[in-house]
Amino acid sequence: MNSYENEELIARYSKRKQYLYSMKQNYLPIYQELAILGDPRNAYFTVRRSNGDISQVTAKTDDTLQSCLPLHAAVMNSLLTPAAYRWHSMVFPDNEIQEQYGDQLAFQNEFIYKKRYSSLSNFTCAMNTLYMSNALYGWYVLELSKDLKHKQVCYRTLPIKEFVIDQNERGFVDTFYRTVKFTYRNLRQRFPKYMPKKVREGTYQDNPYAWLDENMELLHVVEPSLTKAGKYDSIYIDMTSREIIQKTEEPYCKYIAGRASTFSNTNDPYGFSPVMSILPSVKNLNAVAFDLIKATHHASRLDLLAGDDIINPRNYQDVTSVINGGMDSEGRPQVSVLAQRDMPTLDYMVQAWQKKIKDTLFVDMFMSLQETQSRSATDAMLKANERANIVAPMGDRIARELLQPMIELELAMYAEMNALPQFSKELKGKVFDIVLDNPMLRGQRLDSANALLNMGNTLAQVQQMDTEFNIDRTKIYLASAYNIPQTVLNTEDEKSAIVAAKQQQAQEQMMMENAGGIGSGIKNLTDAGVNMESLNQQQA
């Protein structure tokens, strides 16, 4: 590829990146606010405290949001990807093949689990970061890469600020433009043979290694191939030197993006997070927490914060104290309180907003998972069903956009590294399905289990009421009323087979009873014949 083609290709990708960035630009102010409120390093303000000498200290505002995010990640992990639970399996859709070769798929499935949760894997750490990003920003990008030395798939949740993305007509994200800024030294770790144009031209003859510490911008483009269906173009571009470092065609995309939810009236590929819906409440909580701390200071020490209130009243919108003049025995200004804050009301507001954040991020539900008090099996079933239904909207989307593609990508990468257990030759070209079976999905199925239990209780009561009820028709009616899954009911053919089996069993029972009667009659006749013979002998 000559320099003109390179420039043309780089210009095309730059234009495409700018277009995708314009779609993301509207979200950037919101992302900044979320980062400030969800990151404890940014959730500080400064107050003045008089204790002998006046010193500058930092006090933290309410950190409910930041502290709830790890708990939310734990909730999602326990319901979607728990380490101690086999949350997916692989099966052949053909029942005969599954019965004969299903154990080979089970070995493959077990291999994936062992690799994913081994000591060399960072899967759990990556998923924890992913769930927090999903809750805070509404979307995430997971990168899968190959560790050829250990034949291990590596996982990493990347910062969303590095990406602009686009989705296809089915609503799946399949286009990634990732921009990373670092030094050429970092770039050489990924591409050891690459040297930028200015180095090749001899710009650094006096100091041959000086260019390694210069900053550069790397653009990585991954998008569906325009020439081959099912393939992806992967292009690495040095935007500082305006050179294409590498251009390859890959059988898969190593990035996976998903969203918490999306706006139905827009075409934007970026997600809408649970925290976005309560962002005004979170901001108010931090403001009220500041007011509560300030009111507490005024109630305990009237001289505290007086300087802030008088010198910078615009920062707080009100003046709560005034200096009367003069100093006390310790050299502090005399202060009079103009308006005392209502601390119980402020405290109530803080608690209300804290509860709103916890409810939004399912934290209270996570705490109920840790409850140790005894409960009945029915109560436990209903509680598990409730948790599954609450998380279902977000969990179903994660399963569809993340977990299913991730498992397929894991299998493809392990196959490339020749690490998977081998299949039999008879299975070449056969198709198998990946079935998700995590605690969330099982909790949703408890609706049907509970309905089946209620149907059994009702049917038992009906049988005791009146003999005029037709039990078979009653079963059909109750199954329809309780919405029992058809999979647990007999089909018409199965019903006919059961009736035929019952009829045959009845006929066999009748034949056995008849045979018993005939045998008893023969025995009686035999006994009668013996008795008659004895009588004749006596008469003779």
Segments the model singles out, each with a brief description of its role:
Residues 1-200:
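Extended, helix-rich architectural segments
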